[in-house]
C-alpha cells in the first residue's frame, strides 16, 4: 500500500468516493509508482474553527512517464466539496496532461471537468479521435470553457451535473479518459532530443500559468488563508514547474 486512504472517515460523499477510487485504480496501473514527500504542512490541512471548518488532504506520487500525480480532496465549511486531480507527464515522454476537477456545493455539482490536455505540439493528433468517441450525449448542462482554457484539448468535457444519471455518466467519462491515458503512457518511449523535451517543458509551464488565471481557486482559499500562503500553495502544490 503506497499511501493511507484519503480523508479516511471524513469523506462520505459517494460521487467523490467513486471518482477517487477510479483514479487510484488507474494510478496503480502505472509502472514504478512511488510516493513523493512534500512539506507535511501542505499535505494535511485542517481547521475546526466554527463556521470556517476546513479539510484539505493531498496525495503526491510519481511513476514511469509522470513527474507528478496529484490528488486533492477538500471540504470547506461543510458545504463546498472539491476533488482535484492532475497527472503531469515527465517531459521526456510524449504523454498528455490528465486533469479532472469536481466542485460540489451541498448536493449540486456546479462544475465537472475532465481532459487530456496537449503537452506538446500536435500531440492531440494521437488521441483526439479516441476522446471524441467517448459518449457524452446524456449531459444537459454543458458549460463554456473559460478564456484561459486554450490549454485544453478539443474534447475537454465541462458541465454541471443535474441528475444522478449524469453523475454516473461523468464517472464513466473519467474512467474512459483515464483508460486512454494509461494506454498512451505504456506506448510512450523516452525522448533524447533536448529541443523536443524543452518544448514539452514549455507546454507544461504554460498549462500551469494559464491554470493560475482561474481566480476561483484563490478566491476560495483566501477566505481561510492570507495571500502569501495561498500563492505558495497554488505554485507549490497545485501548479508547480
From Swiss-Prot:
Enzyme class name: oxidoreductase
A biological-process GO annotation: phytochromobilin biosynthetic process
EC number of the protein: 1.3.7.5
GO molecular function: cobalt ion binding; phycocyanobilin:ferredoxin oxidoreductase activity
Keyword Secreted set for record: no
Short name of one Pfam family: Fe_bilin_red
Coiled coil location: none
Chemical reaction(s) catalysed: (2R,3Z)-phycocyanobilin + 4 oxidized [2Fe-2S]-[ferredoxin] = biliverdin IXalpha + 4 reduced [2Fe-2S]-[ferredoxin] + 4 H(+)
Signal peptide: none
Keyword entries, A-Z: Oxidoreductase
Protein role: Catalyzes the four-electron reduction of biliverdin IX-alpha (2-electron reduction at both the A and D rings); the reaction proceeds via an isolatable 2-electron intermediate, 181,182-dihydrobiliverdin.
Entry's family note: Belongs to the HY2 family.
The protein's name in its UniProt record: Phycocyanobilin:ferredoxin oxidoreductase
Organism of provenance: Prochlorococcus marinus (strain AS9601)
Primary gene name: pcyA
